[in-house]
Curated annotation (Swiss-Prot):
Effect recorded for H17A: Complete loss of 2',3'-cGAMP cleavage
Pfam families to which the protein is assigned, alphabetical: Baculo_p26 (PF04766)
Phenotype of the disrupted gene, per the record: Knockout induces a 40 fold decreased replication of the virus.
Oligomeric form and interacting partners: Homodimer.
Function field: Nuclease that is responsible for viral evasion of host cGAS-STING innate immunity. Cleaves 2',3'-cGAMP which is produced by host cGAS following recognition of cytosolic DNA and blocks the subsequent 2',3'-cGAMP-mediated activation of TMEM173/STING, which normally spreads to adjacent cells and activates the interferon and NF-kappa-B immune responses.
Site (Substrate binding) residue list: R60, I105, N149, Q169, R182, R184, K186
Protein's name in the database: Poxin
Originating species: Vaccinia virus (strain Western Reserve) (VACV)
Catalytic activity: 2',3'-cGAMP + H2O = Gp(2'-5')Ap(3') + H(+)
Induction: Expressed in the early phase of the viral replicative cycle.
């Protein structure tokens, strides 16, 4: 029987498969599902739109673009998600408004050791370009890149994840803000909104919500 443990409830286990928000005894490819169910209610997977989700546990970053489904009901972290045959395939983890992520083997992913480095998340505003740790209109960013190109590169100290309606990017910068690395994912996505999926705790439970994030536009 497949077992799933929510990172937000302290369920990270380095001996199990790890995906954003969960550790599990199985590695489910969640890209293959078009319909899922929660407590016998069926929900369609959203087409061509994804949610960038991540956990930060034991100085490890586990992030990925995940499928999501629309649901107007209130779902708890840890609620089971099943396929159409009744097999459990995941649990509730992250939410953005009325959309819930389906965690497992997703699309583009990022697994990092955070020893000595930071990672930051940003909403990429429509029409903006990115250089390193800043976003702005294209002409401003072009000038910024020219300015920074004169500097010698140093060790990476921070990663920046940029989530936009049409494209997602990951950049890495040194101490001067010089861009050292960039990845582009040609998919539109959203970031989870923290604390909208509430956790009911017993009096002897401890709360571990290290997987929640604060996503705000940055300039």
């Amino acid at each position: 029987m497949a077992m799933f443990y929510a990172h937000a409830l302290g369920g990270y286990d380095e001996n199990l498969h790890a995906f954003p928000g969960i550790s599990s005894t199985v590695a489910n490819d969640v890209r293959k599902y078009s319909v899922v169910s929660v407590y016998n209610n069926k929900y369609d997977i959203v087409k061509d739109k994804y949610m960038w989700c991540y956990s930060q546990v034991n100085k490890r970053y586990i992030g990925a673009l995940l499928p999501m489904f629309e649901c107007n009901e209130y779902l708890q972290i840890g609620d089971p998600i099943h396929d159409q045959e009744g097999n459990q395939i995941s649990i509730i983890t992250y939410r953005h408004k009325n959309y819930y992520a389906l965690s497992g083997i997703g699309y583009e992913s990022l697994d990092l050791c955070l020893e000595g480095v930071g990672i930051h998340h940003h909403v990429l505003e429509t029409g903006n370009a990115v250089y390193g740790k800043v976003q702005h209109d294209y002409s401003t960013i072009k000038e910024k890149a020219k300015e920074m190109n004169a500097l010698s590169p140093g060790p990476i100290i921070d990663y920046h994840v940029w989530i936009g309606d049409c494209i997602c990017q990951v950049t890495a910068v040194d101490v001067h803000g010089k861009e050292i690395m960039r990845m582009r994912f040609k998919k539109g996505a959203v970031l989870p909104i923290p604390n909208l999926v509430k956790v009911k705790l017993g009096e002897n439970d401890t709360e571990n919500l290290s997987s929640t994030i604060s996503a705000a536009p940055s300039r």
